[in-house]
A protein has these predicted regions:
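Short acidic-hydrophobic, aromatic-tinged amphipathic segments that line or gate anion-handling sites
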Residues: 10-12, 56-59, 157, 173-177
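Structural recognition of alpha->loop->beta junctions
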Residues: 1-4, 65-66, 167-173
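Glycine/small-residue-rich loop that forms an oxyanion/phosphate-binding "nest" at active or ligand-binding sites
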Residues: 1-17
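Mg2+-dependent phosphoryl-transfer enzymes with acidic/Ser/Thr/Gly-rich catalytic loops
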Residues: 109-196
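Conserved acidic, metal-coordinating active-site core of Asp-based
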Residues: 18-136, 140-145
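A generic secondary-structure micro-motif detector
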Residues: 9-10, 74, 109, 152
Length: 196
């Protein structure tokens, strides 16, 4: 186990073999990675340095299916996003939850496990009112989180560099990462004391 700067409260894993088999067949030139329960990654083919953190090991493709994992990541840099979306839609990933990033990037998690399902657990555990939720994101995998926040009366903020459909799903669009969008959102709430 390594220091990630946080302690997981719950890690939900699944067997990635079936879904990886479908993806490898349909996207033979893609790059694949799996996140193990301890937060480390195994990957096949290069991933950007920022994507997997420091604890990652390059491994043969067949090694990826041998572990229970909390996430499968697929990167297909040679494809346009629309083409990638079409391939993923044709595969029909019905036994897992998945979200497409703002490039040809796919995150796959156990069925029913999403950012919003995890955040709802945290919200309930800490007694936070639904209308006090602030969700900030920039990728297609954040749309479900915005919908969850807004359904409870909270606010979804899209980062300025996010794709149009992500911005359209949010309550408000803030500045880009480069222009300190998150800091601008948080400074707008400075001095507000939320009560339970």
């Amino acid at each position: 186990h390594h220091d990630r700067g946080f302690n997981p409260v719950e890690v939900i894993t699944f067997d990635p073999a079936a879904v990886l088999g479908q993806l490898i067949e349909s996207l033979p030139n893609a790059h694949f990675a799996v996140e193990k329960a301890d937060g480390s990654y195994l990957f096949h083919r290069h991933f950007p340095a920022y994507a997997l953190g420091d604890n990652n090991i390059e491994t043969p493709l067949d090694e990826l299916v041998k572990h229970q994992v909390s996430r499968v990541v697929v990167l297909s840099p040679e494809q346009e996003v629309e083409e990638f979306l079409d391939v993923v839609a044709r595969i029909g990933l019905h036994t897992v939850s998945y979200a497409i990033g703002y490039t040809a990037w796919l995150d796959i998690s156990p069925l029913g496990v999403t950012k919003s399902s995890a955040l709802e657990k945290i919200r309930l555990q800490h007694g936070i009112k639904a209308d006090q939720v602030i969700a900030i994101g920039d990728g297609r995998n954040d749309i479900n989180m915005f919908e969850w926040a807004q359904a409870g009366g909270g606010i979804g903020f899209a980062m300025g560099q996010g794709p149009e459909e992500v911005q359209a799903a949010a309550s408000i669009v803030t500045s880009s990462v480069e222009d300190d969008g998150v800091a601008r959102v948080l400074s707008g709430f400075e001095g507000i004391l939320f009560t339970r």
